[in-house]
């Protein structure tokens, strides 16, 4: 360890910033956030610094650097683009035993400013000892993705209740388990949901119940269409905090690979024609049993849980049984598959609206407004439609949709094996059969589908019926 990590209390303490440009602006703003009394010395000031000086937010020293500027300073930051000036600041600071940071110059610095993840009062600092600042910034970005912004509120709440927690849990082992519950349980969940009052109620109840059984929870997470890079930061955090993951058939291996290594994984996917209602009842029972056992359950669904994902039914069940829950949206197939096919769902010249439709309705029910769906100047996105292509095509043509309307079938959208098959509505079922389209596939119908022929950028693209050679193969 070449540098000793230290956090300095600069509240009300004089810090000198030498330089008046953009770098000096950033350093000054950071120091002001830490409560420092900032003095900026430079011949000219950036407008932002000049405004701060006029408002009394900082003091100003005009002209070129002079060692006398260091009088009373606890720290100095040299932020000029002139190495000779920076060296003079460094030498003067060394002579007066004042710590000096020269921006982007480790050789002239006696301290380094780390990359910071700020969840005040929790602060995470990352330093490369001045050797590789880019690496430190990259690590900061990754750490930022792991910590919800409510973590600072949680740290402040824990600090405020620390004496009471110590009194209620005098045994060290009990206290550690209580803090684990505090960090991972319903209190943290309430803060993530922007409900600080309810968070404090949860904490008060736990303190009044000396040995309360652990209380589990469920997070309903949308996994997106398959590309793990489309997972949201909040979804990633949920996967890394899960004790058990109940995942659907269409969740990709790449997404599951991002989950906590020791989390239990239970597949609960539904297969076509295999009794969905019975499977859904099993999912409900599993969520309830695992949550009541005190476990953190992630219910992981392909796409978005609230777009043809039966997420609403699952929340109703959890609410009826008193299980706390959260919802993390995912990128639904219509948005992701269209984007990966290079196909805008709306376009000023072609479509002023989008309709997401399930082609997999409840048995013996078809309540769709086919006359409305057949209108032009709109885009239709059919989910779960591969087995219903003949029916969908017939109904749209019957209600007046033009036979020449373009379509696109996006198979395995956003995954390495993605394939886009395009053509016109009249030939849709035949093209799909001859091309061997298989689920999962999203069907897009509308003028925008033709743009996939020219704007496609990812995976394979096949247009129309296969030629004789392809048929022979």
UniProtKB/Swiss-Prot annotation:
NAD(+) binds at residues 22-23, 43-44. Keywords: Cobalamin biosynthesis, Lyase, Methyltransferase, Multifunctional enzyme, NAD, Oxidoreductase, Phosphoprotein, Porphyrin biosynthesis, S-adenosyl-L-methionine, Transferase. The active site is at residues 248, 270. It catalyses: uroporphyrinogen III + 2 S-adenosyl-L-methionine = precorrin-2 + 2 S-adenosyl-L-homocysteine + H(+); precorrin-2 + NAD(+) = sirohydrochlorin + NADH + 2 H(+); siroheme + 2 H(+) = sirohydrochlorin + Fe(2+). Residues 1-203 are annotated as: Precorrin-2 dehydrogenase /sirohydrochlorin ferrochelatase. S-adenosyl-L-methionine binds at residues 225, 302-304, 307, 332-333, 384, 413. GO terms for molecular function: NAD binding; precorrin-2 dehydrogenase activity; sirohydrochlorin ferrochelatase activity; uroporphyrin-III C-methyltransferase activity. Its EC number is 2.1.1.107, 1.3.1.76, 4.99.1.4. The keyword Lyase applies. One of its GO terms (biological process) is methylation. The modification Phosphoserine is found at residue 128. Pathway: Cofactor biosynthesis; adenosylcobalamin biosynthesis; precorrin-2 from uroporphyrinogen III: step 1/1; Cofactor biosynthesis; adenosylcobalamin biosynthesis; sirohydrochlorin from precorrin-2: step 1/1; Porphyrin-containing compound metabolism; siroheme biosynthesis; precorrin-2 from uroporphyrinogen III: step 1/1; Porphyrin-containing compound metabolism; siroheme biosynthesis; siroheme from sirohydrochlorin: step 1/1. It comes from the Bacteria. InterPro entries: 4pyrrol_Mease, 4pyrrol_Methylase_sf, 4pyrrole_Mease_sub1, 4pyrrole_Mease_sub2, CobA/CysG_C, NAD(P)-bd_dom_sf, Siro_Cobalamin_biosynth, Sirohaem_synt_dimer_dom_sf. Residues 216-473 are annotated as: Uroporphyrinogen-III C-methyltransferase. In the N-terminal section; belongs to the precorrin-2 dehydrogenase / sirohydrochlorin ferrochelatase family. In the C-terminal section; belongs to the precorrin methyltransferase family. PANTHER family: SIROHEME SYNTHASE, SIROHEME SYNTHASE-RELATED. Then it catalyzes the NAD-dependent ring dehydrogenation of precorrin-2 to yield sirohydrochlorin. Finally, it catalyzes the ferrochelation of sirohydrochlorin to yield siroheme. This is Siroheme synthase. It comes from Bordetella pertussis (strain Tohama I / ATCC BAA-589 / NCTC 13251). The lineage of its organism: Bacteria, Pseudomonadati, Pseudomonadota, Betaproteobacteria, Burkholderiales. The gene is cysG.
């Amino acid at each position: 360890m070449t540098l000793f990590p230290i956090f300095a209390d600069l509240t009300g303490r004089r810090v000198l910033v030498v330089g008046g440009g953009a770098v000096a602006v950033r350093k000054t703003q950071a120091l002001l956030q830490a409560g420092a009394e900032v003095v900026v010395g430079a011949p000219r000031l950036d407008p932002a610094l000049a405004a701060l000086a006029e408002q009394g937010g900082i003091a100003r020293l005009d002209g070129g650097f002079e060692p006398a500027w260091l009088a009373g300073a606890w720290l100095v930051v040299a932020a000029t683009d002139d190495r000779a000036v920076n060296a003079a600041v460094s030498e003067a600071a060394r002579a007066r035993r004042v710590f000096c940071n020269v921006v982007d110059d480790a050789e002239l610095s006696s301290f380094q400013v780390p990359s910071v993840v700020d969840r005040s009062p929790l602060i995470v600092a990352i330093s490369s000892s001045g050797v590789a600042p880019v690496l430190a910034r990259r690590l900061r970005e990754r750490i930022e993705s792991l910590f919800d912004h409510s973590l600072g509120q949680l740290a402040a709440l824990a600090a405020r209740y620390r004496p009471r927690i110590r009194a209620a849990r005098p045994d060290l082992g009990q206290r550690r388990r209580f803090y684990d519950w505090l960090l991972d349980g319903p209190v943290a969940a309430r803060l993530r949901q922007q409900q600080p009052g309810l968070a404090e109620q949860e904490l008060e109840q736990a303190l009044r119940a000396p040995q309360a059984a652990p209380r589990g929870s469920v997070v309903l997470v949308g996994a997106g269409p398959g590309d793990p890079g489309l997972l949201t930061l909040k979804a990633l955090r949920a996967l890394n905090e899960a004790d058990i993951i109940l995942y659907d058939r269409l969740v990709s291996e790449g997404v599951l690979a991002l989950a906590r290594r020791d989390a239990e994984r239970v597949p609960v996917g539904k297969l076509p024609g295999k009794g969905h209602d019975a499977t859904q009842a099993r999912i409900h029972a599993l969520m309830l049993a695992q949550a009541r056992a005190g476990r953190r359950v992630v219910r992981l669904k392909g796409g978005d849980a609230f777009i043809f994902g039966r997420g609403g039914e699952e929340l109703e069940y959890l609410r009826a049984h008193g299980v706390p829950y959260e919802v993390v949206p995912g990128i639904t197939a219509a948005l992701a598959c269209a984007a990966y096919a290079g196909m805008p769902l709306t376009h000023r010249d072609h479509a002023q609206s989008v309709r997401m439709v399930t082609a997999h309705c409840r048995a013996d029910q078809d309540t769709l407004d086919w006359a409305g769906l057949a209108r032009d100047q709109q885009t239709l996105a059919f989910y779960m439609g591969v087995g219903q292509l003949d029916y969908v095509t017939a109904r749209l043509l019957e209600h007046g949709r033009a036979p020449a309307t373009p379509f696109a079938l996006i198979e395995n959208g956003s995954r390495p094996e993605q394939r886009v098959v395009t053509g016109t509505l009249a030939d849709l079922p035949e093209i799909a059969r001859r091309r061997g389209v298989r689920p999962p596939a999203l069907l897009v119908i509308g003028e925008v589908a033709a743009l996939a022929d020219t704007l496609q950028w990812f995976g394979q693209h096949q247009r129309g019926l296969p030629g004789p050679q392809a048929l022979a193969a």
